[in-house]
């Protein structure tokens, strides 16, 4: 069906991503590749030279933790693990999804979403932001 699927995930909220796993697998069928993407918030404080080394160490720790959790998440899939790639980036989910989609020539984004609440209506959510700014089809799984 689809050759390249991007699945943004929050490794610190796995149950939200678990919903989307089966849909991503279905879309991947026999030869598609699923790219798991976890986005950590970017740090604007690197301009504070006095704290730059501490911030970098903290970001490296977060990245390492996210990579380990992504590796654990691969076991939730039933498809061949070699067809699941992992990406950890810093920035906004919306921008990083679009950037990775362009780099890979992705066909579709599959993203889990919780039922909307007052806070997501007021502040927006990652899923709604991805939908509004995506240059490719987005499947939202609830």
Curated annotation (Swiss-Prot):
Q: Domain of life here?
A: Bacteria
InterPro entries with a match to the protein in the record = Rossmann-like_a/b/a_fold, Universal_stress_UspA, UspA
Matching entries from Gene3D superfamilies are given as:
HUPs (3.40.50.620)
UniProt-recorded name of the protein: Universal stress protein G
Q: Hey, which family's this protein in?
A: Belongs to the universal stress protein A family.
Species classification = Bacteria, Pseudomonadati, Pseudomonadota, Gammaproteobacteria, Enterobacterales
């Amino acid at each position: 069906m689809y050759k390249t699927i991007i699945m943004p995930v929050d490794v610190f909220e796995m149950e939200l991503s678990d919903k989307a796993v089966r849909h991503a697998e279905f879309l991947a069928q026999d030869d598609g590749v699923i790219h798991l993407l976890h986005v950590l918030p970017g740090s604007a404080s690197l301009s504070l030279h006095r704290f730059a080394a501490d911030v970098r160490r903290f970001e490296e720790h977060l990245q390492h933790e996210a990579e380990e959790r992504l590796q654990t998440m691969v076991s939730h899939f039933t498809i061949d693990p070699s067809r699941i790639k992992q990406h950890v980036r810093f920035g906004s989910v919306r921008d990083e999804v679009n950037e990775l989609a362009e780099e890979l020539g992705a066909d579709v984004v599959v993203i889990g979403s919780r039922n909307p609440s007052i806070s997501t209506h007021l502040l927006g959510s990652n899923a709604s932001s991805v939908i509004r700014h995506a240059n490719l089809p987005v499947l939202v799984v609830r």
